[in-house]
Amino acid sequence: MSKKIGLYWFTNDLRVNDNPLLEQASQQVDRLICLYCYPSITPFLARYAQQTQWGEAKKRFLNQTLADLDHSLSTLGQKLWVTPLLPYQALRHLLTQVEITDIYVDAVAGSDERQAIARIHQDFSSVHIHQQALHSLLSEPQLPFALEALPSTFTQFRKQVETISLSAPMGYPHVLPPIEQGWQLPLMDIVTEPNHSAFVGGEQAGLTHCQNYFSSLLPSRYKETRNGLDGMDYSTKFSPWLALGAVSPKTIYAMLQRYEAVHGANDSTYWIFFELLWREYFYWYARRYGAKLFRFSGIGEKKPLTSFYAQRFLQWKHGETPFPIVNACMRQLNQTGYMSNRGRQLVASCLVHELGLDWRYGAAYFETQLVDYDVGSNWGNWQYLAGVGADPRGSRQFNLEKQAHTYDPKGEFVAKWCGTACDKLNALENLALDSVDMVDWPIAASAYLLIHHPQNKESSS
């Protein structure tokens, strides 16, 4: 009887705990290759984010996660091989060198990864491809509707799924098949740098963070603090580890249930589950709409009335707009790879409404910087704010001055992240959105103010 050789393609399921697909592989094949394809900046992303590299914080967190996964696999007799090749290229190279019988891969939400899987299935039809939903609370058969009939709003989705019983998370696998040898592939070493961030990548760090959170009383007041802008305690901060699959949503839900059994359930503990359901909705939203996630018109046909101004986008990216609260949030993102949920809504509203920019530029830039980037949540939320997604009320615009007064009344957040730059950014010559016109002729700040703020005419003359 010929031996069975498996290929486990890790995507956003970078863990060994609560990984039923890895457990399945351990029981079905005789030898195993564990592969990860390091993400690259695609032409689409380079065009819209105007970036050629990942943010340093994002890259550091990912590398830490990969190193931790490799260590966990080594205790089970396995190794994580990391390649810079695109997924289809990497899998095709391996399949032409090794008689792989089975491929194991998460039921990913991203359309690029799903396209690679479809091509492999078409080109290597004799290979069995096994998929499970490792990034979600529910599997597709558990949904009370066909995926094509996904509810058009989150509220409709929540009402249909929140009472469904969830299976308990699995533990660690006891053993994995030995490594399959005798193949060649371009590989890369993962270099981890000293960590100076509140977020340490990896399954073990993620589990420790979740355990520490539920060992405190913070969950019982989450709903009252969740709109904070800075610090570690105002929200759960589960998202970085959830995004890479270092911790599963089922594991967090089980911890939440244990917390409620000891401390009691209230609106705040329910709201943690509520937020997990938002994430769940956007996972299935991405699965449902695929490439429409990245279209200018979103999931509909109506295009927003926005354009692209290179200077405005640079100001937004660098935190140099006329809006201090936006500047502080963007500088926080650029330095840490993280931004609060409230902050994300404010900077997105600013980009779409105050700056009049195509929402995809903001979504793409977030993808290059966020340590907790999740394809469904990121692009789905940007569509939501731009009025081309799952919000029946259309686009959302926030009063930035009012929001700053509500969530940063003493200006401490702005002062922390902008520092002395605040005075410069608020100076008269920096109030203009544009310093050049449509054909790149310079615009004097005084001329801009006379046109757009005629009430300042006397003081500027």
UniProtKB/Swiss-Prot annotation:
It holds the Pfam family FAD_binding_7. GO terms for biological process: photoreactive repair. Residues 4-137 form the Photolyase/cryptochrome alpha/beta domain. InterPro entries: Cry_DASH, Crypto/Photolyase_FAD-like_sf, Crypto/Photolyase_N_sf, Cryptochr/Photolyase_FAD-bd, Cryptochrome/DNA_photolyase_1, DNA_photolyase_N, Rossmann-like_a/b/a_fold. Binds 1 FAD per subunit. GO terms for molecular function: DNA binding; DNA photolyase activity; FAD binding. It comes from the Bacteria. Its cofactor is FAD; (6R)-5,10-methylene-5,6,7,8-tetrahydrofolate. Keywords: Chromophore, DNA-binding, FAD, Flavoprotein, Repressor, Transcription, Transcription regulation. Belongs to the DNA photolyase class-1 family. May have a photoreceptor function. Binds DNA; probably functions as a transcriptional repressor. Has no photolyase activity. Upon purification from either V.cholerae or E.coli an approximately 60 nucleotide RNA is associated with the protein. NCBIfam families: crypto_DASH. This is Cryptochrome DASH. It comes from Vibrio cholerae serotype O1 (strain ATCC 39315 / El Tor Inaba N16961).
